[in-house]
Amino acid sequence: MANDPKVRLRGMYKIFGPRDKEVLHHVKDGMGKEDLLEQYKHVLGLQDINVDMQAGEITVVMGLSGSGKSTLIRHLNRLIEPTAGEILVDGIDVMGLSEQELRNVRQTKMSMVFQKFALLPHRTVQQNAAMALKVRGADEATQNAEARKWLARVGLQGY
């Protein structure tokens, strides 16, 4: 449907530790992160996250250091596996994808800039912005047009 979100997260939990699925019910029953750490030596990363992201919108994930921003983003492309929850991208259940299907979704439906990213110093800003498209095999005209479009969108046109 036209109103369906581009990305939908439902009931997302991430508990770091070897028995994450076993202790999940304690968190769902109200156990806080301090008690979870003290009693089970597990760390609560995400707790019952529910988000819809529409196509064309800019979504900001903001919070203090250690609040779970990077953990949340890494769940979208399954760089981190959730303890529980649902991830839909264009209506596709990302949790049910094979490695090859997941690789295809990562290449065609999303991208990510890591916190400790490394720009290639011998390339221009536009060439760095176009790098993923080059790796994907897009022609040079498409690479340049897309890079210019997105650089303009974030106020970096002309670099």
Language model features: what each stretch is:
Residues 7, 44-46, 105:
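Conserved structural motif at the start of ABC-family nucleotide-binding domains
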Residues 77:
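Helix-to-loop junction immediately C-terminal to a conserved catalytic motif
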